[in-house]
Amino acid sequence: MQQPLYGLIGGKLGHSYSKIIHEKIADYTYELLPLPTEAEARTFMERRAFAAINVTIPYKQFVIPYCDVVDPKAQSIGAVNTIVNRDGKLYGYNTDYAGFAYLAGVHGVDFAGKTVLILGTGGTHSTVTAVCRDGGAKEILTASRTGKGDALLYSEAMHRPDVQIIVNTTPCGMFPNVGQCLIDPKAFPALEAVLDVVYNPFRTELLLRAEDCGVTAAGGFEMLVAQAVFATEHFTGRQLDTAAIIPAVSRELRHQLANVSIIGMPGCGKSTVGAALAKRLDKKFVDLDAEIERRTGHNIPDIFAQEGEDAFRRYEADVLAEVAKGNSQVIACGGGVIKSPANTRALRQNGPVLWVRRPLEALATGGRPLSKGGAALKQLEAERTPLYEAASTVVLENNGSLGEAVDAAVKLFETDEKL
């Protein structure tokens, strides 16, 4: 007997965590069902050969005519992201509304009396608008690339200093095109919070810039988990303890998917601690220097000797930009990786940055182009310590045995509230 089909339809699903989430909270198998063209989506919907599905970009509006019954909230929003097949009849719902409301609430973002700027005009825009409107927002502005209709151009939106909350509903900054950003939060002196519905990476460039401004910044991962839990209630017809399940699943999966990036002085034990930590956390270990050597075909001392430090830093930045896009890794970085702000931002996007500190006299300096010991090493430490402080989110004192260091690193990771 064929198993009932549960899954997610959308144009591109390579970035999706939905399968992991649904199979964590329910007992059905959940499939990712990419439908690159509208013709394929039309055929899929006409066949109705599924028990229940979620719907993502670009089909949240496309699927509405195929639903026999559309929930009033989904109808008013004009977007459906959850469809349940009950005896051949399709029922459409919108759980993104409750998911986004959860995200805002859990981070203390209150729309009442606020001026809100929403980036993008796609299907998620209408959902976010509804939540902001129902939350009592004073004014809701929209910005887009084209500025059509009532929307501002992004350049025009930058001249609204009264904006207090920004919500990104576009795919800008989403994997694999990380690093992209539509506006600069620094342009908004009254800014209090930035929310981004993008969930991969955990922190988009927009959110990293918002964090640098000292305002509340939250990505879409908790929204993703919340809407999945609410969708599961529709799928199964059972009420769940959402108040307990959503934060528990969010935290568990973030720990499973997060990277741990390790920085520190040359010879402080980054690779040794990193390899052991990766084993303990069941994550892939990446030694960034070894990866640079693998990709360039040259060892690092030779790169420094033959091409100079600037050339090495370019190789390092290129390799790191690709590696940091991944998930569930422990990344041991070279000692000078923090010299580039772009590098530290790449490390921050998917997890904590762990600064390994070790007494200067205990550093291993053999085969390291920039750390020869003595006065030069002291000077290097003095130059880099402020950079390590600025780049790191947690600090590990590596003064004892390897086992002690790894135990401490695991504890820091598991108790990191910023994760």
Residue ranges and their predicted role:
Residues 2-107, 201-203, 213-216, 220-225:
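Phosphate/diphosphate ligand-binding glycine-rich loop within oxidoreductases
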Residues 10, 92-97, 104, 109, ...:
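Glycine-rich adenosine-cofactor-binding loop
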Residues 134-152, 289-296:
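NAD(P)-binding Rossmann-fold cofactor-contacting core
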Residues 150-218, 337-343:
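Rossmann-like adenosine-cofactor binding region
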Residues 197-258, 398:
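Adenosine-phosphate binding glycine-rich loop
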Residues 244-255, 276, 280, 326, ...:
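NTP-dependent small-molecule kinase module
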Residues 290-348:
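ATP-dependent small-molecule kinase phosphotransfer cores
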Residues 349-387:
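A glycine- and Lys/Arg-enriched "phosphate-lid" helix/loop adjacent to the NTP-binding pocket
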